[in-house]
């Protein structure tokens, strides 16, 4: 059974071996996320090499995402996890040290120290650990814990009521982007985006490294990101609803409503949307998710999210492969009751997705024709990815087989809802249509006499302007018997 909603897996110590990565792929992983808040270029380089070798061996559109560290406040390295209890105190310092309970822990960046005030609430590790500032000095802050937990290396930290303007991109981020371009990665997730100028500045950096069109996903994690959402969505290529930091920066009870708003607004703008953070969090430790987590994933799918993301579940959890299998099962079951026609009602007058006027005229009508004809799939040839992205935003019941000669587009489409990318060297319509049908049969999407709707370009045309309703048999004949018994 196919799954239209895509799965993003964060890769970490629990999964960064060839054997585990192949198991994640078999379980349903579509995108491998590398979190550059952790690790080194050397360690990420090893993982990237394994992923590239794997996707070449298996001939699958597995995308690789670089997630930037961004301008966040974060703890430094600790010698070993520091166990804390209510009433315990810990010193945060500006100098770089290997942290411990006795010596304290480094707090990055050091420019925040002058802005910290006593009695300010402190949230660590997505709010799991709470504390309060009891002593604030120029290069040192002392906090007192209000609940128990473990302080680990590189965990996020949020200080309420702090007013400091952090730069959008750090020197580390720029070095990481350069590394990502050199490694020919497929997607960039930009942390703590506040406005469209942040996206523009990152594009200029990518352009200076020779990759101006590298897709950028804007992570919405603070009140400015929410406030400027519409302009950010137009500037970016995709949106990530980063619920962890969002639930710290804003009231946690606001997150569900914002999630629904951003999922719909992303589609209307023509951008894919990723729902992230704590989706199957309990599976970090337990073999089964909670009922609430299953409902959370299902509701994100009902909202029309393009992809759902696993973080600690696959990076460091005890059951990473089972977490992906569970996520895929939830997707498949939920999509049985997905209201596909409800997503036809789309106010896309302000869409930022640039497609030809021909496709705008025939795209939605084509989906309706295919459904009325009981077709089993839509096949579309694309050089830029625009046509399948345009069709995907309407969330059609029919799988979209996207045939492309562009390797960057092939991997980039891995995150698009309902799109199944296929790489080709052919531009002849008869040939690539034949190849797409073979692909559909091999993937279990199509069979012998299924009807298909093909979007293509007419002779001498540069843009998609032609619809053809045909059958798999006619497209494959006379070689169908060699493929389907």
Swiss-Prot record:
Which InterPro entries is this protein grouped with?
Pyr_Knase, Pyrv/PenolPyrv_kinase-like_dom, Pyrv_kinase-like_dom_sf, Pyrv_Knase-like_insert_dom_sf, Pyrv_Knase_brl, Pyrv_Knase_C, Pyrv_Knase_C_sf, Pyrv_Knase_insert_dom_sf
Q: Which UniProt keywords apply?
A: ATP-binding, Glycolysis, Kinase, Magnesium, Metal-binding, Nucleotide-binding, Potassium, Pyruvate, Transferase
MF terms in GO: ATP binding; kinase activity; magnesium ion binding; potassium ion binding; pyruvate kinase activity
Residues binding Mg(2+)? 221, 245
So where does K(+) get bound? Answer: 35, 37, 67-68
Residue positions annotated to bind substrate are 33, 244-245, 277
Cofactor(s) the protein requires to work: Mg(2+); K(+)
Q: Does the keyword Ribosomal protein apply?
A: no
The entry marks the following residues as binding ATP, namely 35-38, 74, 155
What Enzyme Commission number(s) apply to this enzyme? 2.7.1.40
- What family is this protein classified in? Belongs to the pyruvate kinase family.
Q: What is this protein called?
A: Pyruvate kinase
Q: What species does this protein belong to?
A: Chlamydia trachomatis serovar L2 (strain ATCC VR-902B / DSM 19102 / 434/Bu)
* Gene assigned in the entry: pyk
